[in-house]
């Protein structure tokens, strides 16, 4: 029987767990469309702890499987912790218009280190930021998941932008950060919007069709969130334009240094004195190391 915890099987399991985190997150955002608000006035107070626990278990299991399969080094996990903590600290930085430095850090980390790193960095950074700012509540798991999607999508984009000239890569990432400024706000609003008390054109009720639901939410978003998110989107773009090139270069230098070093050696051969024959040069044919190959972790999904 094949070992279910072999490196190949474990790496595959880790990727499946990343997909599972995304599926659980989507289900968590859509759940209130089928569940009514509770009597306490906190519509997500009941299911939020369950979603938090489930996502936490999936993240920890995925990281454990990565370490078990040796697809991630202990140093890369430590780097993930440091980047997540630094990004969480940036949440304390209040920018004009309500922007925050946490999102540009998550986006650049994902672009530099890859999809898996961006996903987990986004999740952990929002948790750290919430602990520092006192922002722990039923909204936290939804903020963390949305931030994780920012980092993961930046990792996918990073595989394409690294082929561009550095200047244009930064411009592309700045535009991407600008779009996510609106996307993040539109996604996170769903943690409470379906269970708002009201029957007006800005609210949702079970009798609405899908098209009517989209129309009502669009009106709600334009009325309550668009201006705030526009400021955040602008902050993302400006920060990336100003610091993106230097931060990406620093991240990628670290990624190269932390990448596993694999050296291949040629099989040892019998020396000339043991075989009774000599080589043309009179030297023994000792094993010599082949050219080392560097496995760059940033290319891993």
Stretch-by-stretch model annotation:
Residues 268-297:
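Intrinsically disordered, low-complexity terminal tails and inter-domain linkers enriched
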Residues 75-91, 174-182:
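Transmembrane alpha-helical segments of multi-pass membrane proteins
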